[in-house]
Amino acid sequence: MTIKYAAKEDISAIAAVEAECFPPAEAAIEAEFVERVKYYGNHFWLLYNADKLIAFVDGFVTDELDLTDEMYENAAMHNENGAWQMIFGVNTLPDYRKHGYAGELISRAIADAKQQGRKGLVLTCKERLIPYYAKFGFKDEGVSDKSTHGNVAWHQMRLSF
C-alpha cells in the first residue's frame, strides 16, 4: 500500500472511486476533480494497492471557519496559507472497507495539517458517522446551516489543535 498526493494522471481513478462511494447528488464529477487537483493536488491523500486506487481523502485549505457548499464547487477558493484544512470527501471502495484504510488517510491528513501549522481540520458528515470521526478527535458542532450539499443534513465536525 502506498499513500501519495494527487496528480493529473490520478483524476480518472479519483472520479471512479467517488462515483462508487457517493450517490450522484453528492458525488463530485471528473471535471470538478480536474479543478481540485489543479488547485490543491497536495491536499489529496490517495491510497493505492499496487496500481489500483482504493481510497482517498481530499479537501482544500482556507481561513474560513465553516465548510460551505460553495467550497465544493469553487476550487479557486483554496488558500495554501489558510488556517483550516477542510475535508470534502473520505472515500473507500466497498471491497476495501473495514480494514482501517480511511482511518490511515485521515490520520495522515491530520498529521500533515499539524506539520503545516494549521489551526485544525473541518469536515461535514451524516449523523451516523459522528462516532467514527469522534475517534480521531473531531467534535460535533451540530447540523450545518452552511451546507445542504445533495439535500442532506450535514453535521459539521472540527478538530482543533
Enumerate the language-model features and the residues they cover.
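Conserved GNAT acetyl-CoA-binding A-motif
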Residues: 106, 112-125
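Conserved acyl-donor/pantetheine-binding loop and adjacent beta-alpha core of acyl/acetyltransferases
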Residues: 55-90, 97, 107, 147-154
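Hydrophobic adenine-recognition pocket in adenosine-nucleotide-binding enzymes
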Residues: 6, 90-92
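A short beta-loop-alpha structural element at the N-terminal edge
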Residues: 2-14
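C-terminal "cap" of GNAT-fold acetyltransferases
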Residues: 126-127, 146-161
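Active-site rim helix/loop that mediates acceptor-substrate recognition in acyltransferases
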Residues: 24-50, 56-77
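Conserved acetyl-CoA-binding loop of GNAT-fold acetyltransferases
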Residues: 23, 134-143
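Short hydrophobic/aromatic beta-strand element in the GNAT-like acyltransferase core
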Residues: 42-46, 56, 89, 122, ...
